[in-house]
């Protein structure tokens, strides 16, 4: 059984990390611009640093960090509450130590000190990876941990911006899908992207107009997702990424407020990820997968919200999207299709896949 579990871990990891994913599974996954925005728009949102630790020297700071590592090594078990508490403690301790060393220019003057900090930091990450195996974490646990350890958790300024943007996205739900076949939808989708690139996006109104029109196309596309397995969609993915990148460039140039670009585009991405995930669940519950490749692609798209919704994006979840996420969480353990895909007992899949998702999150901390 242990050998089979180890094999499953490798299979799950390969599925998650594989670059041989059909382009359709990445249509919704245009997060590169969000990472660009994180770098070039630092004034949009920020969390304050609270240096609660008082160091007398760089050696003192490193000893504190080493002591925290020792406390983690002593932990033999964990649960969701403990994991969240320790992850937040790690972040605050790491930030405080790092900022102290940076202020003292230690990283520039002492390579040995920099190497020690990195070694301790990597060892702490290893201990958190170990802790993922000390409790049977569920999909709900993974979501809770991501929510409660986000640096934007309880950020009132961000929540205010989300509340301001929410009516725009709620209104999109009332717009009907296109009543046409997949060929027509793909043709119209490509035309929208081409026209948008030609026109350009230079104002908030331009951005919202694009998000609204794109939303109709994307939801219409998802209605035919099951029959898109043979379609080449790389051009749609590339054009979408190009437009998103241009939106953030416009924000950098001051044409669109940085806050608006970050919040609306983040909410757009979260919305698409969850729409894609729920559409796949509906298909996989009601239709027979045409091939193992299609089944793997569906699994990849279903778990994408757990992987791709980052610390900023998860803080923009609306109540409706949290409900959608709960639906995904409730459906994943029920479907025997997933267990069949990985050829293993369903109970094992129900805690091993969440474990791997949690490990992936730890690697981003």
Q: Where on the chain are the PLM-derived regions?
A:
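Bacterial N-terminal signal peptides that target proteins for export
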Residues: 4-15, 19-33
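Acidic/polar, low-complexity intrinsically disordered N-terminal segments immediately downstream
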Residues: 5, 50-156, 160, 164-167, ...
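N-terminal export/membrane-targeting signals
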Residues: 32-40
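C-terminal motif of bacterial Sec signal peptides marking the signal peptidase cleavage site
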Residues: 43-46
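Charged, low-complexity interaction regions
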Residues: 76-83, 107-110, 198-202, 230-233, ...
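Long, amphipathic, charge-rich alpha-helical segments that form helical bundles/coiled-coils
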Residues: 121-135, 154, 169, 189, ...
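Extended amphipathic alpha-helical interaction segments
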Residues: 166-307
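A cross-kingdom marker for long, charged
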Residues: 248, 252-258, 262-275, 299-365
């Amino acid at each position: 059984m242990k050998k089979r579990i180890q094999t499953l871990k490798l299979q799950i990891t390969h599925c998650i990390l594989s670059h041989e994913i059909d382009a359709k599974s990445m249509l919704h996954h245009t997060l590169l611009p969000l990472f660009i925005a994180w770098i070039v728009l630092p004034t949009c949102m920020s969390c304050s640093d609270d240096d609660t630790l008082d160091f007398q020297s760089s050696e003192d700071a490193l000893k504190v960090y080493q002591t925290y590592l020792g406390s983690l090594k002593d932990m033999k078990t964990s649960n969701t509450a403990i994991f969240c508490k320790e992850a937040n403690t790690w972040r605050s301790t790491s930030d405080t130590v790092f900022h102290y060393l940076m202020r003292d220019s230690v990283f520039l003057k002492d390579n040995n000190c920099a190497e020690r900090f990195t070694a301790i930091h990597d060892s702490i990450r290893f201990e958190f990876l170990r802790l993922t195996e000390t409790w049977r974490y569920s999909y709900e646990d993974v979501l809770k941990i991501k929510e409660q350890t986000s640096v934007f958790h309880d950020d009132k300024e961000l929540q205010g911006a989300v509340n301001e943007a929410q009516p725009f996205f709620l209104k999109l739900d009332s717009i009907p899908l296109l009543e046409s076949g997949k060929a027509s939808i793909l043709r119209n989708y490509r035309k929208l992207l081409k026209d948008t690139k030609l026109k350009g996006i230079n104002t908030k109104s331009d951005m919202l107009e694009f998000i609204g029109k794109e939303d109709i196309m994307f939801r219409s596309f998802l209605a035919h997702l099951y029959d898109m397995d043979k379609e080449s969609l790389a051009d749609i993915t590339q054009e979408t990424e190009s437009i998103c990148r241009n939106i953030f460039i416009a924000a950098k140039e001051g044409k669109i407020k940085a806050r608006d670009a970050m919040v609306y585009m983040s909410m757009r991405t979260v919305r698409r990820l969850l729409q894609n995930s729920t559409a796949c669940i509906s298909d996989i519950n009601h239709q027979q997968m045409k091939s193992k490749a299609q089944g793997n692609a569906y699994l990849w798209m279903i778990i994408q919200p757990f992987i791709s919704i980052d610390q900023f994006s998860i803080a923009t979840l609306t109540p409706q999207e949290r409900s959608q996420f709960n639906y995904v969480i409730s459906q994943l353990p029920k479907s025997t299709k997933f267990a069949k895909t990985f050829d293993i007992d369903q109970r094992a899949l129900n805690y091993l896949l969440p474990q791997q998702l949690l490990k992936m999150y730890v690697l981003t901390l």
